[in-house]
Amino acid sequence: LDVCAADRDGDGIINDVPENGIVDETLWGNPMTDSSLFEALKADGINAVRIPITWRDHLGDAPDYKVDKDWMNRVKEVVNYAYDLDMYVIINIHHDGGDDSKFGAWVRSASEDYDKFSEKYNALWKQICAEFSEYDDRLIMESANEIGFDDLPQDDAYALLNKINQQFVDLVRASGGYNATRPLLIAGYWTDIAKTCDSRYQMPADPANN
């Protein structure tokens, strides 16, 4: 609640996956992100930004799924533009959860092979957590973006999303540093308020809440 009170006004930054599925910051016509964008937002009274990050084209092979060093460095650079201005910053795994599996989206494959999904999800989030472990509670991690599993019966679909969200919380909390207590943003079902208010949707247990 303290973070919600401090997080007064926000904005979303760049949606970086174009129609052909190749991740590039400029392919939707926007320029490369630089510090001036965040300085302008800050000057307008905005103190929180959500930076959607797509990782799928920048991961190595199983089982490590190593994030490309240049991509991780670029992610941190953009995050730091806002963080260094004392803004709140939300990061996530974004189009990895899209419906375009032919371009490499993989989160929704959890309904078909949970173990394979889980290995990749854990490997990616462990790397993200390690990179940002010393960022304070102005850095907020979001479990996923707009995911649901309509290929499953609805009871099973909700249970699967609940399982993923719990896995996310458990992983982040165990990863050390500020991750033990940092604010987390938990994915709703399709990020749809009506579907997320369904009784089958459950918030994960969080040891940071005692």
Predicted segment positions?
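Surface-exposed, active-site-proximal loop segments in enzymatic domains
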Residues: 5, 14-23, 55-73, 97-117, ...
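Hydrophobic faces of well-ordered beta-strands that scaffold small-molecule active sites
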Residues: 1, 49-51, 89-93, 141, ...
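Non-catalytic accessory regions flanking glycosidase/transglycosidase catalytic cores in CAZymes
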Residues: 1-47, 73, 133-134
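Alpha-helix initiation/capping motif
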Residues: 24, 34-36, 68, 143, ...
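Aromatic-lined substrate-binding rim segments of carbohydrate-active enzymes
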Residues: 27-100, 120, 161-178
